[in-house]
């Protein structure tokens, strides 16, 4: 029993057994030591703390970390996504969106052609307006002349009609002047007499004419005995 207790006491009081060594960690440590030796041999060792502080004042003061690049072996390199790459991307987008030369020339030619067509259409429109105005003036002049000729011909025909031998027989006035003069008279009770002067009361023997004997008798009775108001 004493031996057993001695075994436990010795195991508890003694140093712990060494842990098993990790092969990967050992390999990495070996590689790091070799790289450090190569850098020391080539003169590219790690910079001193004062050099790092002087090279990166923004980091020492706690600001301006965004403006500084990446430090590798004491040299500062610009980040890949910095302002220079931004300008290059903008220039590339401009080149992509720029019109081809052929399309630009075609667009300019079309614009020039449309301007020429607009100018020609305006000139043609002005010519048509002037021609229409001239034609309208000529038509108005011809119309006025035709109206005057018709008036003269109508007066001649009226005079010839009123001067015919049977003008009094058919109940018409002898002349146009007398008819106008009588029509302007405002004698009460003579209205139906003026109407009767415009009517032909002679009976027609032609079978093609309509029978207006009843209307003639009504007009004759109104002429003799006008309506009393």
Swiss-Prot record:
Protein name: Clathrin light chain B
InterPro entries in alphabetical order: Clathrin_L-chain
A GO term from the CC aspect: cytosol
Disulfides per UniProt: 199-209
Modification Phosphoserine, positions: 11, 13, 217
Keywords from the named record: Acetylation, Calcium, Coated pit, Cytoplasmic vesicle, Disulfide bond, Membrane, Phosphoprotein
PTM annotation (Phosphothreonine): residues: 187
Organism: Rattus norvegicus (Rat)
Membrane topology category: Peripheral membrane protein
Lineage: Eukaryota, Metazoa, Chordata, Craniata, Vertebrata
């Amino acid at each position: 029993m004493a031996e057993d207790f001695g075994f436990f006491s010795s195991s508890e009081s003694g140093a712990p057994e060494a842990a098993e060594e990790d092969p990967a960690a050992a390999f990495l440590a070996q590689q790091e030591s070799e790289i450090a030796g190569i850098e020391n041999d080539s003169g590219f060792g790690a910079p001193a703390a004062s050099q790092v502080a002087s090279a990166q004042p923004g980091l020492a003061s706690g600001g301006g970390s965004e403006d500084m690049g990446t430090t590798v072996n004491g040299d500062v390199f610009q980040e890949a996504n910095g302002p220079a790459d931004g300008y290059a991307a903008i220039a590339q987008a401009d080149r992509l969106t720029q019109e081809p030369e052929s399309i630009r020339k075609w667009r300019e030619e079309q614009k020039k052609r449309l301007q020429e067509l607009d100018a020609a259409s305006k000139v043609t429109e002005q010519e048509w307006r002037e021609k229409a105005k001239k034609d309208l003036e000529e038509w108005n002049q011809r119309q006025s002349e035709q109206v005057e000729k018709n008036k003269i011909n109508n007066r001649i025909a009226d005079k010839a009609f009123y001067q015919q031998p049977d003008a009094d027989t058919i109940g018409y006035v002898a002349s146009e002047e007398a008819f106008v003069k009588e029509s302007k008279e405002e004698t009460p009770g003579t209205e139906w007499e003026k109407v009767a002067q415009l009517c032909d009361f002679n009976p027609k023997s032609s079978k093609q004419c309509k029978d207006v004997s009843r209307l003639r008798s009504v007009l004759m009775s109104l002429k003799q005995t006008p309506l009393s108001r």
